[in-house]
Amino acid sequence: MADSKEIKRVLLSPLFDNNPIALQILGVCSALAVTTKLETALVMTLAVTLVTAFSSFFISLIRNHIPNSVRIIVQMVIIASLVIVVDQVLRAYAYEISKQLSVFVGLIITNCIVMGRAEAYAMKSPPIESFMDGIGNGLGYGVILVLVGFVRELVGSGKLFGVTVLETVQNGGWYLPNGLFLLAPSAFFIIGLLIWGLRTLKPAQIEKE
């Protein structure tokens, strides 16, 4: 029987209290690369959440039958299989977004969040809790991606989901887009500000010297 308190903890804790990007500093590379648009940030969130949740679930199901010496290989095979499925579904039903995400869908295989949850939680916990832990960490990753994508697309182009929100001067409006926000380094600064804001609200997250 699944423990409801544990499910609630693993589902909600990664959102802010133990965010994989803001606190654990995992999955930063893809956060820089796929957040120029809110649409790609949301699709990447969905892809990572599905892969993390189902890989944790399947790994937890067979955890007692995996020899310790090959556990990382088994985890990688399961994760890679799920990533291939997600990649093929995106190519079939969202080809343009798949092209924009480029190699970063494939690189979910090596995402530290996915591997980390498989090794640290799924190998020691029941399947339902592991599945919910995967969803929680995927959503925690997604919260940062969506916030960064929102700021970068709006400030960088005056659009959200490709729809004009702030009329630019090129089209007779008042807004002058800041192209710097469409470059990867801008995501570093936005993530840094989010980490600062989160640790200001939650001082317990500040590392002790």
From Swiss-Prot:
GO terms for cellular component: plasma membrane. It comes from the Bacteria. Its main location: membrane. The chain crosses the membrane at residues 42-62, 66-86, 103-123, 131-151, 178-198. Its EC number is 7.2.1.1. It is found in: Cell inner membrane. It catalyses: a ubiquinone + n Na(+)(in) + NADH + H(+) = a ubiquinol + n Na(+)(out) + NAD(+). NCBIfam families: nqrD (TIGR01939), PRK09292.1 (NF006777), PRK12405.1 (NF009070). NQR complex catalyzes the reduction of ubiquinone-1 to ubiquinol by two successive reactions, coupled with the transport of Na(+) ions from the cytoplasm to the periplasm. NqrA to NqrE are probably involved in the second step, the conversion of ubisemiquinone to ubiquinol. This is Na(+)-translocating NADH-quinone reductase subunit D.
